[in-house]
């Protein structure tokens, strides 16, 4: 057999050296004196919508045309239109009860008016029965958990996924504050520290101390927040400021969650140094916010695109391009009119 293949190759049949028979012959008689073996490694493949999903964000309490507070049932009526526009994932900012203590007003005003709902990211407030609810509760005025389940069911009927915001911080009215004060930072006088991002101050929010002496119990509880919503049909999440929490927590938490929920998709909202954004991708975040919003000229877009798609980052960092967010509206959109909005939408959808 070998001589026949040699003769065919010498007569100009180049394929003879590449045939299945000769390959099997070489494999069978190859020397094995230097052969080594290694462990079999598992390869995790991202869900399809982590690779190509289009996200649509809206506040469910604004889903009515009049001035009334909408419910999640009202919001569900908008889902067919979102599907028709071509989106795959509907992202809801926090739907939890909102704290009343130190509630903020419009434009981060230090006091709220009688009709101001407060910031949805000030998580933790009073439920209809007078008890306090937190990250595992739905705001009563949105319809409670029953309305949330109906919203998710309707989205799934249309082929849409629902994404929830995970913001690990608490209003002064959150049950964690009363039940686990050791999970928070304390001032010398014993009071709890509020969140700050100078020059901004967020008196309506207490940051969580991930390095508390009671960190094992804290970490397990925070992981259970994901598990709670997974049980309600949500496997896609947007994480608020993950770079301000320990990397070790995310690596452990996301690995544990994917043991039972491999279809998990987690978007990192981390506007920080590129190296930090890339590290979050390496430890388990499928997608990441980017600086697309601030790249507007052809030169800026070209340079930024090359840094994302023509470097080794393409192997592990999957960028999301958002034309705007609830708290970021670039001057190009403020003053550019409808044409600017359309062009940024097209760029975000096609780059």
PLM segments and residue spans:
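Aromatic- and acidic-residue-enriched carbohydrate-binding clefts of CAZyme catalytic domains
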Residues: 52-57, 62-70, 98-151, 178-216
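An acidic-aromatic substrate-binding cleft motif
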Residues: 2-89, 127-128
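Active-site beta-loop-alpha junctions enriched in small/polar residues
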Residues: 61, 95-97, 167-171, 242-244, ...
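Active-site-proximal helices and loops of the catalytic beta/alpha 8
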Residues: 240-319, 336
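Substrate-binding cleft of carbohydrate-active enzyme catalytic domains
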Residues: 79-96, 127-194, 214-239
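Active-site-proximal substrate-binding groove within the catalytic cores of carbohydrate-active enzymes
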Residues: 226, 243, 311-351
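Short amphipathic alpha-helices and their capping/turn segments at secondary-structure boundaries
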Residues: 44-45, 76-90, 152-156, 307-312, ...
